[in-house]
Structure formats: C-alpha cells, structure tokens
C-alpha cells in the first residue's frame, strides 16, 4: 500500500471539515489521546493533557478572520506503515478568504496515525 486508505483519511477529512465549518461534531474521535499539533497560531505547539481542546479554542479564534475555506488534498507523500501506525505527508491546497480577501495557500500536513 502506497497511500493511506479511507479509514486513515476519514479523520483527516473530518478535521478539515471542522476547520471549514467550525462544526464540533466533526472532531469526535479525530484526536489521539497522545496528541501533538504544530500550528501557525499561538501557542504554536499543542501537546499533552488538554491539547485537543486548546487547539480547538485557538483555531476558533484564528478562524475569526477566515471564511469560505475549501481544502483540496493531493496524493500522499512519504507514506509508510508499520503494524498499527502510519505516517504520511498530505499536500493540501486551502482556498478561501482571509480578512475578506481571497487567498490560496499551498502546503502539507504531516500525520502519524495509530489504530
């Protein structure tokens, strides 16, 4: 297998859907108990107890200047899997509005997923 399967992509898609809609129901079951998130908003590193809740609150604040977010995923890069753990980089194109002005952002997300 060279790509994440649909079970691996489901939480990624739900996370992106939360980011686009701020609908908390999309976050159910998305985050692992042992969680680390690196972000572009303070405090930039979210880990340990309460990381998911702190990231959510930070993102909601960050998203106040964003609108009409649409993610587009490319083919996964650097996919590897061992036992119940998988790693991959997911090229992502975000488009939408920032402070009312159209933007496009090209980047990538790195994921380590465990079953």
Regions found by a protein language model. Name each.
Residues 12-14, 70-77, 112-115:
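Short, highly charged low-complexity linear segments
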